[in-house]
Amino acid sequence: MADSSLVVLVDMDGVLADFDRAVIEALKPTCPDIRVSAHSHRLHRAFPAYAEQIKTVTSARGFFSGLKPVQHAVAGWRLLAELGYQPRICSSPLAAHPDCEAEKRGWLADLLGEQAAFEAYIVRDKCSCPGIALIDDIPSVECEPSDWEHIVFDMPYNQQSPSARRLRGWLDPKLPDLLLGARRRYRQRAGQ
């Protein structure tokens, strides 16, 4: 069992895997104005006229298997381990995709190894996962109480995030300090 004071939860879609780019590339021929939105982290909300096409693309077999990694994602994952943390994927499944969990685990195994795939949390409720921090592109996470702190993975659509902690890509030099602070506060809350 992992020591929760060393676990860093990492979202998959938008943080490790370039979900939006895959959707945009698939839809560009028929939806030329679709792009990463500055207003919503959900493409189907930012472009409601394309909601059905987006659902068709993201629920297709092979969608998750074919995702490309976010720039420097593998280096960032390795850095977490080099810093002494235990990175764990914490990702939500898409209900409309019948093979979502299996494809996500396959993608993780190919990119990060079998252990990362095996240890991944593919759950609807990220709040229940133990750790000191959750690195996620979602602008805000409603979890009370939660053991972990939300670190926003910088994207155009989360600039208005209320989170005081922000990671500007995997090579952001603030990463070690963000995690050190999260671990210190986690241990204080736990009385360690």
Describe the role of every protein-language-model region.
Residues 1-55:
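Active-site neighborhood of HAD-like aspartate-dependent phosphohydrolases
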Residues 5-7, 156-192:
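Charged phosphate-binding loop/patch that engages nucleotide di/tri-phosphates or the phosphate backbone
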Residues 56-89, 96-102:
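Short, acidic loop-to-helix structural element flanking the phosphoryl-transfer center
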Residues 86, 92, 99-127:
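Active-site donor-binding segments of glycosyltransferases and PAPS-dependent sulfotransferases
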Residues 135-171:
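Acidic, Mg2+-coordinating phosphoryl-transfer loop and its flanking beta/alpha structural elements
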